[in-house]
């Protein structure tokens, strides 16, 4: 796969994991063209022998017109061989994950679903129709273990769990449709683990130190997982170690 990667897109390249993915992929595929997509994407310094990323700013995950326009820019010079969608939120502002169903708030829930489910689904809508009918193609979207219905033994976190469970179903359905277009294409969900960030800080207390990852470590793992998947695994969800997460 490494020798065949000429174009890469990282959507959500301004976030901690997205930025780390961009850095890792530029190092791994130094001759490839990397498209770094975000609301505002800072320029990055390139190392010797390494291309600078092509930055695509002004991306709004909550606006389908923006998603359509951005996807059109991504495929303008050819469909990428490798795509990561590194978008998503756990909480926003004062809206923390619900401990009880009594904590549900319509506005907060709709926002979380818009960011974690609707936005990534529309990215798939506007990108997957450009996948070539032959040849390798890989796409991974950030999901989460808590989106697994069978794994839910604690309850709570209603909106976040629901948004990720819905995303996993969208990935499964889109992968089935994509296989009819290109039998070698791979589309999967990826669980990055608990990553050190301002958003995860309130929930790090009970996380064992060896399971609290830096963005760089998580990114390296996710790249390895996506590159090692086979077409018969398309539509599934995997954690950072490559272990399948049951629905």
What is the meaning of each model-derived region?
Residues 49-67:
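Rossmann-fold cofactor-recognition segment
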Residues 28, 78, 126-135, 181:
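A short helix-coil junction within the Rossmann-fold of NAD(P)-dependent oxidoreductases
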Residues 89-93, 97-113, 122, 133-181:
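Catalytic loop of short-chain dehydrogenase/reductase
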Residues 26-46:
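Conserved glycine-rich Rossmann-like NAD(P)H-binding loop of the short-chain dehydrogenase/reductase
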Residues 178-195, 233-234:
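Conserved Rossmann-fold SDR core element
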Residues 11-27:
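N-terminal Rossmann NAD(P)H-binding glycine-rich loop of SDR-like oxidoreductase domains
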Residues 189, 202-247:
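C-terminal helical subdomain
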């Amino acid at each position: 796969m490494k020798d065949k990667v000429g174009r890469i897109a990282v959507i959500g390249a301004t976030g901690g994991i997205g930025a780390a993915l961009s850095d890792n992929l530029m190092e791994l595929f130094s001759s490839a063209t990397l498209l770094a997509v975000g609301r505002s994407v800072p320029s990055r310094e390139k190392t010797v022998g390494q291309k600078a990323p092509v930055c695509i700013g002004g991306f709004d995950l909550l606006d389908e017109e923006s998603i359509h326009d951005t996807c059109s820019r991504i495929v303008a010079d050819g469909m990428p061989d490798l795509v990561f969608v590194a978008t998503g939120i756990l909480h926003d502002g004062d809206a923390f994950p619900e401990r009880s169903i009594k904590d549900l708030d319509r506005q907060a829930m709709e926002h979380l679903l818009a960011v974690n489910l609707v936005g990534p689904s529309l990215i798939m809508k506007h990108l997957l129709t450009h996948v070539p009918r032959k040849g390798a193609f890989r796409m991974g979207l950030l999901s989460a273990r808590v989106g697994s219905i069978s794994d839910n033994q604690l309850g709570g976190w209603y909106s976040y769990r629901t948004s990720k469970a819905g995303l996993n179903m969208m990935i499964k359905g889109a992968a089935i449709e994509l296989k009819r277009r290109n039998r070698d294409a791979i589309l999967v969900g990826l669980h990055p683990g608990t990553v050190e960030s301002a958003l995860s800080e309130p929930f790090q207390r009970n996380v064992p130190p060896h399971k609290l990852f830096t963005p760089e470590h998580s990114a390296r793992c996710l790249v390895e997982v996506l590159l090692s998947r086979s077409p018969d695994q398309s539509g599934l969800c995997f954690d950072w170690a490559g272990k399948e997460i049951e629905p």
